[in-house]
């Protein structure tokens, strides 16, 4: 099998050059560990740039952290990033301290490269040299993007400082100034990078000019720089300077969206997928394999699944008439049926096709979670259909995949990898063209320029791929639907399990979706409860215990402990340890003082 860009993550020198386990303010200068002759070949420069790619941390950043913070799908234990998203942590929480320290370690790698790469001038082709510098400038922005989203104002360092340097103890720089820097850096980096990188080539996984412009649109959107976001998106759309990428489709509306996130469509090995602009590439076939465990985590066949999707996520999908479930006559999930458990099947009927391409549904025939909620009933009905899913399993008896909410995620699940522990090497997409279209639509809405033509170029392109009814402005109005709400719904549905939801909620000031905010209305407080299926959807409701909680309509309440306080939880607390090391970081963020 082809060996591709995964090699950029596997080399010994950068591990020696850049590894460090001490606190950010206590680490040794990297230049003391560097041979004086290191910058004397392109391979050496490339290896140094490659060392900075660890910044992306693949599945950990986009799924474990970014998705783990959200209300889309909850991690199976109340720990780590789920605990942060739940608002149930303090300034001494180790998860945040670790992320903060790692970010500044990664920044030092980038700063070190950018302070030294020109030592190779006259040895390495100048265009190639600036390309590597452009990649590292992008990666440095990537770090600052998450730092500013998490903590707002943060220490702003753009050069490798020696231990004890007084600048290490500076106060925090305003977020707005760092955003200005990020946008300028991305625009400049794009000019030094190849316009795009073709899928299924040895360079796929490296950063392109298109990736820099897409990241520029993301940074600008998150920070409400609507005009900048609009221009960055237009540079990637037809007629733009960086136009190349397009939505992945093979003309199979019931399959293409799902395939985009499996081996069938992974861009590192499939030349036909031009949607992925930047992906973290894994390869289990290398001598030193790179891998993750996502597919198994979604259907772990003898334990509790790791990501438990919520009722609010499933409810977000429209019916095929383009209406929300509470307005559509086509929605069947509210009815009563005989047998009662068949109501679970009805949840998936007459819905946006992306629902069945994102979630396991009754009749799904690539189920590797072993025994489902019907137990031996599967074999009794048809012994040949052991891989057909029928009902959710709540009984944790070690015989099958257990869900806490009643839903199993199908998106990003490569069926062939479910039985294999930690052997998944599917790409993890960081930026794709579908996000660019959604960024453009939101920017245009906020510029009061979102008309039917823009919707047709963005939202309806995404819907066309799956054969979903188009969004029509006049129909939204006639059905009493709010355009802003529907744009936000589209973003949640299309980008589910891609690590965007928490950032979107922070931008939209909708933190009450993450946990109960006592300052909000009762209706909004209800949104902070994480729920699952209706009790009678279960094949055998007797699996629920006396302590299982349900709301007044019979829907399972999976987690009612989550809290959100505004403005406090719109930013994280600065880590206590870091404030001890540098008192100039104080005061802490609002609400955390």
Predicted regions mapped to residue ranges:
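Bacterial Sec-dependent N-terminal signal peptides
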Residues: 1-30
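Long, intrinsically disordered, low-complexity segments
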Residues: 20-21, 90, 103-106, 181-183, ...
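An aromatic- and glycine-enriched ligand-binding surface/loop that stacks and positions planar moieties
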Residues: 21-79, 209-216, 220-388, 515-530, ...
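Conserved, well-structured interaction surfaces
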Residues: 41-58, 79-151, 167-180, 186-199, ...
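Structural register within alpha-helical repeat arrays
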Residues: 133, 140, 209, 216, ...
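TPR-repeat structural position
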Residues: 179, 226, 450-452
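C-terminal substrate/ligand-recognition segments
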Residues: 345-460
């Amino acid at each position: 099998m082809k060996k591709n860009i995964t090699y950029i993550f596997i080399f010994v020198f950068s591990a020696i050059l850049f590894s460090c386990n001490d606190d950010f303010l206590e680490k040794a200068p990297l230049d003391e560990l560097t041979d004086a002759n290191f910058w004397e070949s392109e391979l050496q420069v490339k290896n140094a740039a490659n060392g900075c790619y660890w910044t992306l941390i693949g599945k950990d950043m986009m799924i474990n952290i970014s998705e783990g913070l959200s209300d889309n799908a909850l991690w199976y234990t109340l720990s780590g990033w789920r605990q942060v998203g739940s608002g149930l942590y303090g300034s001494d929480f180790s998860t945040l301290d670790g992320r903060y320290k790692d970010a500044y370690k990664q920044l030092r790698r980038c700063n070190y490269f950018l302070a030294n790469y020109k030592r190779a001038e006259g040895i390495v082709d100048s265009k190639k040299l600036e390309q590597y510098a452009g990649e590292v400038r992008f990666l440095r922005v990537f770090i600052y993007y998450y730092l500013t989203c998490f903590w707002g104002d943060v220490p702003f360092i753009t050069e490798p400082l020696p231990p004890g340097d007084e600048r290490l103890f500076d106060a925090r720089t305003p977020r707005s100034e760092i955003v200005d820097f990020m946008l300028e850096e991305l625009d400049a980096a794009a000019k030094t990078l190849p316009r795009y990188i073709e899928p299924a080539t040895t360079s796929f996984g490296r950063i392109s000019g298109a990736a820099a412009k897409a990241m520029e649109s993301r940074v600008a959107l998150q920070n409400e720089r609507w005009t900048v976001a609009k221009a960055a998106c237009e540079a990637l759309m037809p007629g733009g300077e960086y136009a190349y990428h397009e939505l992945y489709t093979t003309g199979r509306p019931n399959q293409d969206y799902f395939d985009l996130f499996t081996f069938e469509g992974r861009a590192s090995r499939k030349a036909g997928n031009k949607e992925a602009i930047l992906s973290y590439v894994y390869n289990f076939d290398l001598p030193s394999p790179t891998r993750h465990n996502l597919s198994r985590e979604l259907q772990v066949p003898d334990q509790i699944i790791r990501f438990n999707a919520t009722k609010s996520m499933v409810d977000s999908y429209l019916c095929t008439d383009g209406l929300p479930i509470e307005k559509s006559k086509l929605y069947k999930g509210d009815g009563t049926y005989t047998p009662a458990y068949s109501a679970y099947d009805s949840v998936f009927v007459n819905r946006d096709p992306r629902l069945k391409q994102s979630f396991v549904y009754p009749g799904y025939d690539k189920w590797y979670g072993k025994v489902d909620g019907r137990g031996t009933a599967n074999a009794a009905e048809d012994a040949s259909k052991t891989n057909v899913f029928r009902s959710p399993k709540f009984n944790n008896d070690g015989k099958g995949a257990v869900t806490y909410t009643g839903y199993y995620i199908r998106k990003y699940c490569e069926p062939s990898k479910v039985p294999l522990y930690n052997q998944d090497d599917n790409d993890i997409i960081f930026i794709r063209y579908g996000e660019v279209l959604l960024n453009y639509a939101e920017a245009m809405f906020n510029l009061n320029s979102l008309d039917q033509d823009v919707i047709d170029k963005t939202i309806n392109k995404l819907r066309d791929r799956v054969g979903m009814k188009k969004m029509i402005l006049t129909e939204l109005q006639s059905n009493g639907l709010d355009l802003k709400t529907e744009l936000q719904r589209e973003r949640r549905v299309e980008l589910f399990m891609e690590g965007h939801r928490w950032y979107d909620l922070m931008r939209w000031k909708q933190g009450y979706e993450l946990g109960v905010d006592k300052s909000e209305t009762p209706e909004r407080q209800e949104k902070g409860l994480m729920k699952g299926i209706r009790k009678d959807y279960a094949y055998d409701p007797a699996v629920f215990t006396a302590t299982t909680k349900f709301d007044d309509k019979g829907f399972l309440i999976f987690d009612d402990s989550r809290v959100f306080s505004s403005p406090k939880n719109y930013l994280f607390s600065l880590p206590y340890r870091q404030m001890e090391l540098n008192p100039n970081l104080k005061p802490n963020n609002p609400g955390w003082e």
